[in-house]
Amino acid sequence: CAGTIGRINHEIFSLQHTEILELEEPFFMGKVGSSTMPHKRNPAVLENVLALCRNVRSIAPSIVESMVSENERDWGCFLSEWEAIPRACHMFGAALQKSKYILENLIVYEKHMERNLNAQKGLMMSECVMMHLARKLGRLTAHEIVYKSCMKAYEQEVPLKQILMQTPEVTQAFTEEEVDLMLNPHSYIGLAPEFVDRVVAKWENI
């Protein structure tokens, strides 16, 4: 459990980096991130949760060690568990409480997500283009064509669409509108909405 909660919070922590900033822990006016740099909005609560979860996980080895005991009653094991288990529960309880606060008040930056999706100027959608082209030219041929197009777009620092529209195999197979659709991240989310609905429905029934 401490691993799962830790990972969730670490993901939010990573996505709060200034250059990414897709998510942010709850913020309110008056919350100070630094005594010397007034602009800072540090992930203090997230850091607290990560430390708590790390400490809980560090207790696991001592509890595992208690599995080896002398016959049926080994007070050396009992005393170790009496100290380790309550300490782990207290810290994990605090981690859960803080995580609940974070998730219920999480700040989501949709515009930043959109910006990050388009940061590579379409390269992220190369799989979608390749899979569509594979239906017409075969998987290996399509992969080679899209690979070369991507490397050219990367090296020239231009949008992938610009290179694709200069590639005969692509323009013979698709219209410009179809290429635009394939390069649109919103059209390539698969079953993600269904998975989200399933998880939410399961949670509501708990």
Predicted feature locations:
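Acidic, glycine-rich loop-and-beta core segments that form the ion-binding/anion-interacting portion
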Residues: 1-57
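Catalytic-core signal marking the mid-to-C-terminal active-site face
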Residues: 35-206
